[in-house]
């Protein structure tokens, strides 16, 4: 008898610190460990595991990507709840337009949803107190999940 945990498959594209892009599938659990509802890509990036398991196209085996060497991850054809929880997708906070430069010098423009009280709503306060290593950067083309350790600079455009 084979026992298996049901999972959701999500297509992702990952940029690593060596400048290589990888496209593959990430498998998410139906129930998250840290909140109500299904596990999200951001949950997987910010959990305590050192490696992110991804299945590359045409391969049966899983490739393990060291999270410390992931610069950013883009969710392909995202459905609501795939990348972020519904609370995180609700852009109810202050929208902060930013220009972000990440290793190896790539530049992104987008915005952050600053979910913070007025007294702690400066960009520096918000970025420095984000939980986990990864945070969402909303852009016109996609949602980018950025590794804070790979950010060279963030500039407010507001």
Which ranges hold each PLM region?
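Conserved RNA-binding domains used in RNP assembly and mRNA/RNA metabolism
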Residues: 1-158
């Amino acid at each position: 008898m084979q026992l298996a945990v049901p999972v959701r498959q999500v297509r992702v594209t990952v940029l690593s610190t060596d400048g290589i892009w990888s496209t593959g599938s990430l498998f998410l659990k139906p129930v998250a460990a840290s909140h109500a509802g299904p596990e999200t890509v951001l949950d997987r990036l910010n959990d305590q595991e050192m490696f992110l398991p991804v299945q590359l196209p045409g391969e049966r085996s899983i490739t393990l990507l060291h999270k410390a060497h992931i610069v950013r991850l883009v969710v392909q054809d995202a459905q609501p709840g795939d990348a972020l929880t519904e609370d995180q997708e609700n852009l109810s906070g202050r929208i902060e337009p930013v220009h972000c430069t990440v290793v190896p010098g790539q530049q992104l423009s987008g915005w952050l949803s600053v979910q913070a009280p007025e007294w702690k709503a400066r960009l520096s306060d918000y970025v420095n107190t984000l939980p986990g290593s990864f945070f969402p950067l909303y852009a016109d083309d996609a949602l980018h999940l950025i590794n804070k350790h790979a950010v060279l600079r963030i500039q407010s455009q507001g």
